[in-house]
Swiss-Prot record:
Localisation: Secreted; Target cell membrane
Keyword check for Transmembrane: yes
Phylogenetic placement of the source organism: Eukaryota, Metazoa, Ecdysozoa, Arthropoda, Chelicerata
Protein name: Amphipathic peptide Hj0164
Keywords noted in UniProt: Amidation, Antibiotic, Antimicrobial, Cleavage on pair of basic residues, Cytolysis, Membrane, Secreted, Signal, Target cell membrane, Target membrane, Transmembrane
Range of residues in the leader sequence: 1-23
Chain positions listed as propeptide in the UniProt record: 37-45
PTM sites of type Phenylalanine amide: 33
Native species: Hottentotta judaicus
Family of this protein: Belongs to the non-disulfide-bridged peptide (NDBP) superfamily. Short antimicrobial peptide (group 4) family.
Functional note: Amphipathic peptide that shows antibacterial activities.
Gene Ontology biological process terms from the UniProt entry: defense response to bacterium; killing of cells of another organism
GO cellular component: extracellular region; membrane; other organism cell membrane
Domain of life from the UniProt record: Eukaryota
């Protein structure tokens, strides 16, 4: 159980690190979705 808690803590730290660099996160999302913004994905629905 300790390893699971440590893994969750690592995910939280990683999430905080990604939110600190929104430019990097935006570039990563654009690579994944192939769209300029998430609004384009919403209009596809």
């Amino acid at each position: 159980m300790k390893s699971q808690a440590f893994f969750l803590l690592f995910l939280v730290v990683l999430l905080l690190a990604t939110t600190q660099s929104e430019a990097f996160l935006g570039a990563l999302l654009s690579k994944i979705f192939g769209k300029r913004s998430l609004r384009d994905v919403d209009t596809m629905k």
